[in-house]
Amino acid sequence: ECKQTYFKKFMSRTNFQDLLNAEVHFGHMTRKWNPAMAPYIFTEQNGIHIIDLNKTVVKIDEAADALYQIAKQGKKILFVATKKQAKEIIAEKATSVNMPYITERWAGGMLTNFSTIRKAVKKMTTIDKMSNDGTFENLSKREKLQIARQREKLQKNLGSIADLTRLPSALFVVDVMKEHIAVKEANRLGIPVFGIVDTNSNPRNIDYIIPGNDDASKSIDIILSAVVDAIGEGLKERKMEKEKEQENNANEKQEKKAKGGRARIKRGENAELNANVAEKFLSEAEKEEA
């Protein structure tokens, strides 16, 4: 089956003018640049590198296509952004498509030591159970306070990944330089990395590069909106396919049931026919005896 890529089937998710208005094109000062970003730089202006937005449009579509496919398969994408201007955007966008996210400090080993992180999340769940089943009532005031503080800390750092029961299938990072530990862990485990990459960052360890301003909230918002829309559509497609599959299964069951009914009717007809034949045989036998 020939599959067209997502971004070819649909119009581009963004356009040059919208990205320009959102200041996606503003890079860092030329003296802070990373030469590996040269292919994505259009020019320099007043000592600042200007990103080629035509390339950004294409790269957003490529990332959107890949994320659409991941979401369609029912896999999880972990969003990471601990810088102030990106936190709220990431939390809002990731939550809208029921994806996990990290906006507080990245705990070393979040991916490479995932089993330990899961234990911490389970600890949080255990505390919640204690609170609900009345176990808390048997503790001293001091113990209650200690556990409550522990629960608060766990919620702050890990609450947004509480539903992540296995390693994510992809990582989406805002500011790959700031989140270099997360990128390194994903690289080590072979988890594909999607990232907004500014002119001062190294794109070499990023699988899906989106060249753009990773400091301005407007820039972060427009890029995130585009990729999250694609994820949402992937999830919608998955839901539709599941519903269709369930409908087909239900139809198959009904057909089998109907066939079984028809078979029973035939067996009934055969029994009646056999009884008539047997009656004739008996009648003939009686005549012969007479």
Model-derived regions, located:
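Intrinsically disordered, compositionally biased charged tails
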Residues: E1-R13, E233-A290
